[in-house]
């Protein structure tokens, strides 16, 4: 066929042969034979060009230079593959090369120097892990296409609208009759079917179209699968775009670190960089750089993953940093930033600058920042996340295609994570809603019982700044230096120098010089009273309220132990790994014990942290430094000591610990401590659990509301009452009365 061949560097020559538009090639041949000028010219990638474009002074040098394969570079690649697989030259064929290539510095240097274009389809599949996915999949691409062909969903309709918008200047996708359009439709519909929680995103369309230019349809699909599941974080292409939004925050953090002058400029002009760079990341540069540069970027991207997106973006910004700094106004800066990708013409220069500037950036550093900023982003939005959304934060979930395990297998080895995810994530929104309602009920109780709490703001603060203030507020002790006590019994006033009070009255202590008789004030009167008739209040960081005292207001006990504690327990039980058939107990208390111990041990192991604690955290009554971690550890130990003595159940222990956290106003900080103990959380919880998802930050913000109220809850409220002799109290009072008659009391202290 006359149109079946295209010369090197000629139209469509860089594309996979199966996507060559034969009708256009046939017309080219006819025009050449008749010496007529063709209606349009196309480059080797199928993009429409104008013959005189190369003569224009503003045209791109990169666009006008033909794609030439470097013969020595191809030989180096062949030598590496032969050496790695120990084959003779004549025996080396792609079917004999492993589905994944062993990673090494040599391989990385080859990738960085560029993959020979003719080897890209096979090497991309191996570097990205797509070939492994293709061979291991239980469903073939043909079956996936068949299942998705009749899928008349919203995603399918949107795909149909965007087919001609994706790459209109390319002959393979220019019209509904173009050869690439049916391929793109099948790939996008297959992806939307396989990843129902993602559906369709325009970013996937651009990436898929570029892949289809160089790979066969099935291989392009599995490349997209590798990008979605492995190379990019979860939620990159979801409706919320949480993944790519998070990466924009990570990018701003990296700019502060690597390009401080540019960071200062962006802050001075109040420029939101994500408005420009989000599209770069969403399409992996497919829609913003020249196709020749894109090939070099993707060589590295498929080998090293999403870290490359940050490195190259930093490199681009660095190359234009001086021009940006010299810009006169915000509009000029914004326009310059927007034009940066299209002005990148030297691939070697860009890659060299990017690696010199940010080559030290590691996946661990990127993932650490992602985890933090994703959690803050979710909390900042202040939204109740649905089950599907929360699921997609930790991993991309495929449509279930595996057969269900047998009952015996499930008992011995547990259910599949996906099966458990499907069954349990349905209630996530309900769990958060139940907790929020429990918190509001407690808050309304305080406002109704004690009017001074009416001004407390009950709307959670989801801002990033709120997390920074948490520890500052924890460190700050009570600004009121009053020492107060609560009356345990009625004390009737008989003399002018005595202070009478009723049970549960709050007395301001003036003097504690005597062991038995203290001096205090109540309602403007000052006098002495029996010390054993009162209980000193812990008001280091709060002001006592009868609404939170379970010895005065019984209703608070029902609200806390009967409503709030079960709601919190349900969250801690969500995704808790169940024991095997021969396993032991499974309860959130066991996780809390282990996490508290691990965190406090980590602090003790750090000499530096011990040195700065005195400047960072408040002191307890003994003058000892207590971090939130240490306070949690002590509380757990205290609960164990008192509750084990009466063989209390773990449910009771958990409720008592929550009461201690409310008393100390640190319940939200304790949740942060527990969820930050990653090894322990991963040991006890499934990947889809609430505590392993960034959703815990939202719960922390909800719990923070409770630290605005003063609780005085008994840790041992559910334990059997102890029989205490009343004689010591009477003897103490008798001693006090003797002293009163023998000595003259100075009630002025």
Curated annotation (Swiss-Prot):
List every position bearing Phosphoserine: 406
Subcellular compartments: Cytoplasm
SUPFAM superfamilies for the chain: RUN domain-like, SH3-domain, Ypt/Rab-GAP domain of gyp1p
List the Gene Ontology MF annotations in alphabetical order: GTPase activator activity; small GTPase binding
Q: Which residues form the signal peptide?
A: none
Query: What InterPro entries does the database record attribute to this sequence?
Result: Rab-GAP-TBC_dom, Rab-GAP_TBC_sf, Rab_GAP_TBC_domain, Run_dom, Run_dom_sf, SGSM3_SH3, SH3-like_dom_sf, SH3_domain
All copies of the Rab-GAP TBC domain together span 114-305
* Family matches, as Pfam families: RabGAP-TBC (PF00566), RUN (PF02759), SH3_1 (PF00018)
Q: Which residues form a coiled coil?
A: 415-439
Can the keyword Cell cycle be found in this entry's annotation?
yes
Tissue expression summary: Widely expressed.
Q: Which residues form the RUN domain?
A: 555-718
List the GO biological process terms.
plasma membrane to endosome transport; positive regulation of GTPase activity; positive regulation of protein catabolic process; Rap protein signal transduction; regulation of cell cycle; regulation of Rab protein signal transduction
Under CDD domains, the record lists: RUN_SGSM3, SH3_SGSM3
Q: Where is the SH3 domain?
A: 480-539
Keywords, alphabetical: Cell cycle, Coiled coil, Cytoplasm, Growth arrest, Phosphoprotein, SH3 domain
Give the highest taxon in the source lineage. Eukaryota
Does the record's keyword annotation contain Electron transport?
no
Kindly state one GO CC term assigned in the UniProt record.
Answer: cytosol
Family from the record? Belongs to the small G protein signaling modulator family.
Q: What does this protein do?
A: May play a cooperative role in NF2-mediated growth suppression of cells.
Q: Subunit arrangement?
A: Interacts with GJA1. Interaction with GJA1 induces its degradation. Interacts via its RUN domain with the C-terminal region of NF2. Interacts with RAB3A, RAB4A, RAB5A, RAB8A, RAB11A, RAP1A, RAP1B, RAP2A, RAP2B and PDCD6IP. No interaction with RAB27A.
Q: What is this protein called?
A: Small G protein signaling modulator 3
Which species is this UniProt entry from? Homo sapiens
What's the name of its gene? Answer: SGSM3
């Amino acid at each position: 066929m006359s149109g079946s061949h295209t010369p090197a560097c000629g139209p469509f020559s860089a594309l996979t042969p199966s996507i060559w538009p034969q009708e256009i090639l046939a017309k080219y041949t006819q025009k050449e034979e008749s010496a007529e000028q063709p209606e349009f010219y196309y480059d080797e990638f199928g993009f429409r060009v104008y013959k005189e474009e190369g003569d224009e002074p503003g045209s791109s040098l990169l666009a006008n230079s033909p794609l030439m394969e470097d013969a020595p570079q191809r030989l180096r690649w062949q030598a590496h593959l032969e050496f790695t697989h120990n084959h003779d030259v004549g025996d080396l064929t792609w079917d004999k090369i492993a589905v994944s290539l062993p990673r090494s510095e040599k391989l990385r240097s080859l990738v960085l120097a560029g993959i020979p274009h003719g080897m890209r389809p096979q090497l991309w599949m191996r570097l990205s892990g797509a070939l492994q996915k293709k061979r291991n999949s239980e469903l073939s691409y043909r079956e996936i296409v068949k299942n998705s062909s009749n899928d008349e969903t919203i995603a399918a309709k949107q795909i149909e609208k965007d087919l001609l918008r994706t790459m209109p200047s390319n002959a393979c996708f220019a019209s509904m009759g173009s050869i690439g359009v049916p391929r793109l439709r099948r790939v996008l519909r297959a992806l939307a079917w396989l990843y129902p929680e993602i559906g369709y995103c325009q970013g996937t369309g651009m990436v898929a179209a570029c892949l289809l230019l160089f790979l066969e349809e099935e291989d392009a699909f599995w490349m997209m699968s590798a990008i979605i599941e492995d190379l990019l974080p979860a939620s990159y292409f979801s409706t919320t775009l949480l993944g790519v939004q998070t990466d924009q925050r990570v990018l701003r953090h990296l700019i502060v670190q690597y390009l401080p002058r540019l960071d200062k400029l962006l802050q001075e002009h109040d420029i939101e960089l994500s408005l420009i760079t989000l599209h770069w990341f969403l399409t992996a540069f497919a829609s913003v750089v020249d196709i020749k540069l894109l090939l070099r970027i993707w060589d590295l991207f498929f080998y090293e993953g999403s870290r490359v997106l940050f490195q190259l973006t930093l490199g681009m910004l660095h190359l234009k940093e001086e021009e940006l700094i010299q810009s006169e106004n915000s509009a000029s800066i914004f326009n310059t930033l927007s034009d940066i990708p299209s002005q990148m013409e030297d691939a070697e220069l860009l890659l060299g600058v990017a690696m010199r500037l940010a080559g030290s950036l590691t996946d661990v550093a990127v993932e650490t920042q992602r985890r933090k900023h994703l959690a803050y982003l979710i909390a900042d939005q202040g939204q109740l996340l649905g089950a599907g959304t929360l699921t997609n934060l930790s991993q991309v979930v495929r449509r279930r295609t595996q057969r269900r395990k047998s009952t015996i297998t499930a008992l011995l080895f547990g259910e599949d994570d996906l099966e458990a995810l499907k069954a349990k994530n349905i209630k996530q929104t309900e769990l958060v809603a139940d907790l929020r309602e429990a918190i509001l009920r407690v808050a309304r109780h305080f406002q109704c019982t004690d009017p001074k709490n009416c001004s407390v703001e009950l709307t959670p603060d989801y801002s990033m700044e709120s997390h920074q203030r948490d520890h500052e507020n924890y460190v700050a002790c009570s600004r009121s230096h009053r020492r107060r006590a609560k009356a345990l019994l009625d004390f009737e006033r008989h003399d002018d120098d005595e202070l009478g009070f009723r049970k549960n009255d709050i007395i301001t202590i003036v003097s504690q010089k005597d062991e038995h008789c203290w001096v205090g004030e109540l309602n403007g009167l000052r006098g002495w009273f029996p010390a054993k008739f009162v209980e000193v209040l812990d008001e280091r960081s709060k002001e006592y309220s009868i609404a939170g005292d379970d010895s005065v207001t019984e209703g608070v006990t029902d609200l806390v132990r009967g409503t709030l504690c079960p709601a919190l327990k349900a969250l801690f039980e969500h995704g808790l790994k169940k024991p095997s058939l021969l396993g032991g107990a499974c309860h959130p208390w066991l996780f809390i014990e282990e996490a508290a111990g691990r965190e406090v041990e980590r602090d003790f192991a750090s000499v530096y942290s011990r040195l700065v604690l005195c400047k960072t955290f408040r002191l307890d009554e003994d003058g000892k430094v207590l971090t939130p971690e240490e306070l949690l550890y002590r509380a757990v130990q205290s609960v164990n000591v008192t509750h084990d003595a009466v063989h209390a159940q773990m449910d009771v222990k958990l409720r008592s610990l929550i009461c201690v956290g409310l008393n100390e106003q640190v319940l939200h900080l304790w949740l942060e401590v527990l969820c930050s103990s990653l090894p322990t959380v991963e040991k006890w919880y499934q990947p889809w659990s609430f505590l392993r998802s960034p959703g815990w930050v939202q719960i922390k913000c909800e719990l923070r509301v409770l630290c605005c109220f003063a609780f005085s809850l008994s840790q041992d409220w559910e334990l059997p009452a102890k029989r205490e002799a009343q004689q010591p109290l009477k003897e103490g009072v008798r001693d006090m009365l003797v002293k009163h008659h023998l000595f003259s009391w100075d009630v002025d202290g």
